[in-house]
């Protein structure tokens, strides 16, 4: 059954043409090849490691993104397509209950088979079929649906490119050898010191939030709606390691008065003393584990790999708060959306380079926690069919992050993009900036 999904597309319906098909075919090859580039540094043994229930093995990621194209597009819209292996529908379905049962998330790391070679063959099989399907002539409305779904599949794959880097980093950190994902020297942009932390004032008022118009957006970014903002101030850059270090040295992790109750319980149970990946040696010197290996902690880089609880506690400690997602988006629409993204190749945040905008560093480097719970926008409706499970069913017990990170593809992010994680998670590249009331 054909459904017209509510996905904002690149052009109006009457402009869909061979140009769009060519564009999508080129983008398909580019995105799929980028995933293969990301796994090139890995050894065979790295592909099946799952160091915690939060992460997935790299092999599972490259198979799951392929399954998405096979199950959501080829099996639905190509009568001539032959499924590569029917068992893969169980192995590589992530969480789509409407499609059927699936391998439990915490057991993805037990799948020594299919082999990496098998999964690469699976990708090649599906890639050829998708490109063939795209180039076939058909009724315009059906072609539009297929093109929209291919675009969504590519956006989904870009999310998993970031997840591959997140998960590999965590897997390697649990290894006593602390191996580096990449050993090449990467020139990092940025200055030796971050600019001083100041605040920019905004009058607020009645503003519009959400996505509409041309360009892709997920269903959780719409519809556009009104939001009232009281006057507020927003920090001109994210909080740095130097500033967060002051919180640590002041005993912030031991002082319950700064923490939400659930947050302090997590801190106590898991014995947090610093952000994830920070390491202190016997001489009291700090280092940090990165995808480039262990490096000295650079104090002027944005603090990264902190949970919502840590970001919130720090904000309370210094008499500020986190911005709401509406405040963040309102400002984010007004600034340059360039930043330190995956394409730069360092896979690590760097100090804010430019201080020539009212607010800097909102895009790239680190995802920024907001004070907003992940919830549907007014009058929002999930997509039809299985894709209705993509976002809507996770709108509980999660907090919103904005802006993208150093492992996010640059053409994947926008001011309206809503990322989300449970408040205790911190293996994602998450930081924060301060806000305040006026």
Residue spans for each PLM region:
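Disulfide-stabilized, aromatic/cysteine-rich ligand-recognition loop
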Residues: 5-56, 60-129, 133-136, 143, ...
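Short, glycine- and charge-enriched coil/turn segments that flank and shape catalytic ligand pockets
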Residues: 79-81, 136-145, 185-194, 357
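Functional-site microenvironments in short loops/helix caps that host divalent-cation chemistry
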Residues: 153, 157-159, 163, 167-190, ...
